[in-house]
Amino acid sequence: MKSLDDLDFDNRFARLGDAFSTEVLPDPIAEPRLVVASPAALALLDLPAEASDEPVFAELFGGHKLWSEAEPRAMVYSGHQFGSYNPRLGDGRGLLLGEVLNQAGEHWDLHLKGAGQTPYSRMGDGRAVLRSSIREFLASEALPALGIPSSRAACVIGSSTPVWREKKESAAMLLRLAPSHVRFGHFEYFYYTRQHDQLKQLAAFVLEHHFADCGAAERPYAAMFRQVVERNAELIARWQAYGFCHGVMNTDNMSILGITFDYGPYAFLDDFDANHICNHSDDSGRYSFSNQVPIAHWNLAALAQALTPLVEVDELRASLELFLPLYQAHYLDLMRRRLGLGVAVENDQALVQELLQRMQGSAVDYSLFFRRLGEDAPEQALARLRDDFVDREAFDRWGEAYRRRVEAEGGEQAARRQRMHAVNPLYVLRNYLAQQAIEAAEQGDYTEVRLLHRLLARPFEEQPGMERFTRRPPDWGRHLEISCSS
């Protein structure tokens, strides 16, 4: 393990030059204090958990101090927002402090969110509020524990700096980690501004550092785009299988690495609703839960358009056509595992779709259903679960088909239970749990947010005394829509 003074910086993106980012120093927040830190994320930087206890920790990630090797820069990019192209976005309140090289040879971006105004702030104050910072922190650490690729969050630093949104709130900073912060929108920016030399420079940078195995291909950029499609197909399959709704799938919020990125008004499903809209600002439902698959494909097509100076259109189209079958294969495999099924058979897709149709419109908690399905033998589990369904006879028919499917595979119930509990979480980051932790934190009590973070780091393991986190949400906490305000 290292100390905060010993981090090894290797700022590769900064070396691309001023066409790609602008030098900006962090604007410190007043009276910085640690709200919560992630030992697992700090370990990616070879830092021990105790590093967050040092006074200099809050000063560094509250914008008061800076390593001499750091090169803070605001990145420029554009993107399609709710389907409309915005020609100039960029880091409006975040700074890429630099890239840390860990002992495993991995580069990790240090991105400080809420670091003040930049040339891309667009009338904004450059700040992030405590509320949104806690939400991003919790999700960034909860999703990887579920096996969903994501950026990571090392810490949240609170302050006494006031900011105004719908009401007066306090500013905070979040340290986000990722192997890269390059977005689809980076490529769009250089394509639509006709800076094709810079577009190729960016593509070469991403190829060298993040898709090196594509470098030996006959057409490296075509191979790289195909991998981007493959990674996103698997990512979206994991979102859908675990009931995660991102809420703002603009192309500037899509990582070139195929990881979950830029958390805003996200949600995990409570009662299953394929049409759930978690973003209060999404009047048309563009980014509803069921639309995430076609929107991901749309976003990949937007990226493909930006790559046309580098890759033949036919090759881009061929890769795009792979998205849906790849997604379906990953999704069906995940759902099969969630149902405790180990062997693929022809009617598995129909079995999954029929279950979701029975869930729709019923008071079925999406996460708890799968957990409880594995608790006992199918007959007993199905008998307990049927009361949650509106059409119980239809559910009984599904249950009988499922029971026969389990019976055909054979095996002991104890092994089935262990197998299902290993992929079906008992603890899920529900919006009402995050809201309760936020309300306590806004009063200066960080106990709940720290407890929730520790709990969600082990979502599949039953943890003594944590029964209240396994319950269905109260009426006020069901289907919460969250504002983009942050």
From Swiss-Prot:
InterPro entries: SelO (IPR003846)
Keyword list, A-Z: ATP-binding, Magnesium, Manganese, Metal-binding, Nucleotide-binding, Nucleotidyltransferase, Transferase
Binding site for Mg(2+): 253, 262
GO molecular function annotations of the record: AMPylase activity; ATP binding; magnesium ion binding
Stretches that traverse the bilayer: none
A family per Pfam: SelO
Active site residues per record: 252 (proton acceptor)
Purpose of the protein: Nucleotidyltransferase involved in the post-translational modification of proteins. It can catalyze the addition of adenosine monophosphate (AMP) or uridine monophosphate (UMP) to a protein, resulting in modifications known as AMPylation and UMPylation.
Name assigned to this protein: Protein nucleotidyltransferase YdiU
Species assigned in the record: Pseudomonas paraeruginosa (strain DSM 24068 / PA7) (Pseudomonas aeruginosa (strain PA7))
